[in-house]
A protein has these predicted regions:
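Conserved P-loop NTPase motor cores
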Residues: 312-314, 450-484, 497-504, 520-526, ...
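P-loop NTPase motor domains
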Residues: 35-53, 276-279, 292-299, 380-381, ...
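Switch/coupling segment of Walker-type NTPase motor domains
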Residues: 60-75, 81-82, 92, 102, ...
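Extended, folded cores of ATP/NTP-driven motor/assembly subunits in large transport
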Residues: 1-410, 420-421
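P-loop NTPase motor core of the ASCE superfamily
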Residues: 100-101, 540-585, 729-817
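Charge-patterned, long linear interaction tracts outside catalytic cores
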Residues: 125, 439-445, 450-452, 457-470, ...
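Short glycine-/polar-rich loops that comprise or flank the Walker A/P-loop
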Residues: 53-56, 109, 490-492, 517, ...
Length: 817
């Protein structure tokens, strides 16, 4: 029987004149939380349930659908800049590819909570009793009219206003603990259409008009409008329902809990959370909860205790052994009685129903078996009562009553709070750059890298910098390249420091943006002498002077604490900075002019580098012009013949060529400061591949902090691509990194360090195993809201896969022959 009598906003009246207020509980992220954080959520939910001393609660987990096309269309609105047309075309192609892979819609679990509104005692005065009698009489007349005419359903405006006031108080109570949204008529209609087998409609696209006629004392709605969402041919069999529409049919089966045979220990009892990850098909769940007040609960428990004692005495008098079941039950009852007496808590009658649907009977059987096995593993025994399918179906409808008393479970608020209602895995944004999907839930993951600095509500960082860490071959460079590419398409600008020259073929492999790719390949050719001199590449003389000091102290090993050599070098650099033309070769001249033993020593030391391999790039005589332009959307800087030290090599063990290579990286990275200080309205990325090479030296570490701080002020993100999270884990840098991506690692110390970098429990073996077992292309990701999950990076297009793949090509058998 259809229970709903009237709907007004989020209020639902049923045929027994009970009124429920329904809300959508905005899901909260639950993945990778520490036990302490889980207990905080548990306590909040327990208090939410326990605050209702009487009445009923109806909790629903419903597998709704969200439109992929709609999300992609919203993402298009974020695109700006020169490559807008290319980006729009790319997003359209991406949409078609995603739809062909996973369909128009993807499953999106929503959580609904309904609370029965209880009339307060002060409303029992004479005036209200008179009004109540009058309303009852009017209701009788309306019922007669409805029975005879079967057209309109009416509700007194006074009645609506009275419950609306009560609902406001309730909403205020709940919203202190959880984010909620009041339901509307279209939410109820979607819910009913979903339960009656209609699918393929995205939740956000669904419309449902519920016209009302507001009269002076009452409001009318058409009865047909109320029942319209249930239009469908329902055929009941013993253990399933067949739901038939004009263009489709589906089969539905309902399970209920028969017994809980073991302890459901928290935290590992979060059924609502785990079943989202477990099942590849949609599963709906309903909890119909009736609150039993403390006094009534104690009476029930004490009566049960008397029954058990009678059984015990009867066995004793008959000379038999009391069965172990009775002894265990007596212990449990004693414990429960003490608990209820001390805590003054209520008990709860729980009717727990699971809905499984499928397009055909064979698939329904397979899915039912899978659901049953899942609950079996949790010590929960399910049953599919024959002939009760229609009744259990009714329990899912808003404001419905409990259908059957045979399968009631008596539970406490602790049990209900431990089921993980509202818990889900959320990652990234609702729209933006599609980078892949969550491994646990299969949901698409979208990012907006420029969002951190906007101070969006809920974000835990305003840092635009990002880190990509992981061992060789895990996919960090690929993920980094993909994110930079799409950021540029969406209107950003990027400069990539490419020490291994892996991106030199991008003009050929990315023809759609080739005109906006600028590859600067700096060779050690004599015509390029002095091209990377700090005085040549830096616009600001102060910045150039600062970089010149950094480079020369780095190469010569002179410390700023060296009271003999450092002042001499500093004076020479300052003098050159004040000249009309400046270059590092002039520093050597100034030192020779000084003509002291110390200055000659320093001059000789610096001069020994000037003609060593590609070091000539650093030394100019002041006549060289800056030939490096970073005005394109995507700029790649490559220095030929760089030899980077091994990750484990200490600074003291660097060879001369390695020392020079790192010096080059420091110069180019500092040059990126000028790029960062360009147009503040455009989001910019400075991408530092093999960042560990200069993060391990003092000058590089100082520079990275400088870049990150300048970036935050100037709408620019610095992306660190490195093999170890330890490189970016120093407090000064770690706190300024927003998005984090960690790829597979097998070293236990490195894994612990990475988990610590993410703010996770580094000693938790499950966390360690997750990171160790990641496949190629999968990463642990932390978004701007501090949420962590495992993402499968998904390029969608095969041409992007080839363009960004940095693995060496495998020779075919033909080549080998």
């Amino acid at each position: 029987m259809f229970p709903i009598k009237y709907i007004d906003n989020n209020l639902v009246w049923n045929k027994d004149n009970e009124v429920f207020a329904y809300y959508e509980l905005i899901p909260y992220n639950y993945s990778f939380l520490s036990p302490e954080q889980k207990y905080l959520v548990h306590d909040s939910f327990r208090q939410l349930i326990a605050q209702s001393r009487e009445g009923k609660i109806h909790a629903l987990q419903i597998a709704t659908e969200s439109s992929i096309r709609s999300i992609q269309e919203q993402s298009k609105k974020l695109v700006t800049g020169k490559l807008r047309e290319v980006a729009i075309q790319k997003i359209d192609d991406q949409t078609e590819a995603l739809v062909s892979m996973i369909g128009d819609n993807q499953v999106d679990y929503r959580f609904f909570l309904g609370f029965k509104l209880m009339v307060t005692e002060d409303e029992g005065n004479l005036k209200n009793i008179k009004k109540s009698v009058f309303l009852t009489f009017r209701e009788f007349l309306n019922e007669v009219r409805h029975t005879l005419m079967n057209d309109f359903v009416s509700m007194s405006n006074d009645e609506i206003n009275r419950y609306a006031k009560m609902e406001k108080l309730l909403e205020n109570k709940i919203s202190r603990r959880f984010k909620i949204r009041r339901l509307e008529a279209k939410d109820f209609a979607y819910l009913m259409e979903h339960l009656y087998g209609r699918d393929g409609i995205a939740y956000e696209d669904y419309m449902y008009p519920l016209p009302k006629r507001k009269l002076k004392k009452e409001t009318l709605i058409k009865y047909y409008d109320l029942i319209r969402p249930t239009r469908c041919v329902v055929e009941e069999s013993q253990r399933y329902l067949r739901l038939e529409h004009e263009d489709s049919e589906s089969y539905v089966s309902y399970f209920t809990v028969n017994a809980i045979v073991g302890e459901l220990d928290f935290p590992s009892s979060e059924i609502f959370y785990f079943q989202q990850q477990q099942f590849t098909f949609p599963v709906d769940t309903s909890m119909n909860v009736e609150i039993v007040g403390n006094k009534k609960a104690l009476t029930t428990v004490r009566n049960k205790k008397k029954e058990l004692k009678d059984l015990d005495n009867h066995a004793y008098q008959a000379g038999n052994e009391t069965s172990s079941n009775v002894v265990e039950a007596l212990d449990s009852v004693d414990e429960l009685e003490t608990d209820l007496d001390q805590s003054k808590e209520s008990m709860y009658k729980l009717s727990y129903v699971i809905r499984v649907s499928a397009p055909d009977l064979d698939e329904l059987k397979r899915r039912c078996d899978e659901v049953k096995d899942f609950y079996d593993d949790l010590n929960v025994k399910l049953v599919r009562p024959a002939g009760d399918m229609m009744g259990l179906h009714g329990e899912f409808l808003p404001a419905s009553k409990r259908y059957i008393n045979d399968y009631i479970q008596y539970v406490k608020s602790d049990f209900l709070a431990g089921l993980g209602f509202g818990a889900t895995q959320m990652l990234g944004e609702n729209t933006g750059i599609y980078i892949g999907y969550s491994v646990d839930t299969g949901r698409n993951v979208y990012l907006q890298p420029s969002l951190a600095s906007q101070g969006v509500k809920g974000t835990v960082t305003n840092a635009l910098a990002s880190a990509f860490v992981g061992s060789l071959g895990g996919g960090k460079s690929f993920c980094n390249n993909l994110l930079v590419y799409y950021s540029v398409l969406f209107g950003g600008q990027a400069v990539i420091l490419d020490p291994k020259s892996e991106r030199g073929n991008w003009k050929a492999t990315l023809p759609e943006i080739a005109e906006e790719i600028n590859i600067v390949n700096i060779t050690s050719d004599s015509s390029n002498q002095g091209l990377l001199d700090p005085y040549v590449i830096m616009k600001d003389v102060k910045d150039a002077e600062s970089l010149a000091i950094d480079i020369l102290t780095f190469l010569t090993g002179i410390s700023s604490r060296d009271g003999e050599k450092f002042p001499v070098l500093r004076k020479a650099v300052r003098t050159v900075s004040q000249n009309q033309n400046h270059g590092l070769l002039q520093v050597i001249e100034e030192l020779r002019k000084e003509d002291t033993a110390v200055s000659r020593n320093i001059a000789d030391h610096i001069e020994s580098f000037t003609d060593y391999d590609f070091a000539q790039l650093l030394f100019s005589d002041g006549s060289v012009e800056n030939a490096i332009s970073l005005d394109n959307q995507l700029n790649i800087i490559q220095v030929a013949d760089l030899v980077l030290p091994d990750k484990d090599t200490t600074f003291d063990e660097y060879t001369t060529i390695e020392l020079l290579s790192v010096a080059m990286l420091i110069v180019i990275s500092t040059f990126a400061l000028d790029f960062i200080h360009s147009d503040r309205s455009i989001f910019k990325i400075v991408d530092l591949d093999e960042a560990w090479a200069f993060l391990n030296v003092a000058q590089g570490e100082t520079l990275s902090n400088k870049l990150v701080r300048a970036g935050r002020a100037m709408n620019a993100g610095v992306y660190f691509v490195t093999q170890s999270s330890g490189d970016v884990s120093k407090e000064s840098l770690k706190n300024n990194i927003g998005l984090k991506f960690a790829f597979r690692s097998t070293d236990t110390n490195e894994i612990k360090q990475t988990l610590e970098f993410f703010g996770l429990d580094s000693e938790d073996e499950n966390n360690q195993k997750r990171l160790r077992d990641l496949e190629n292309g999968q990463c642990l990701m932390q978004d701007l809201y501090g949420r962590v999950g495992v993402v499968q990076i998904h390029p969608v297009f095969v041409e992007l896969l080839h363009a960004f793949d940095t693995r060496p090509p495998i020779k075919s058998e033909v080549d080998l022959e």
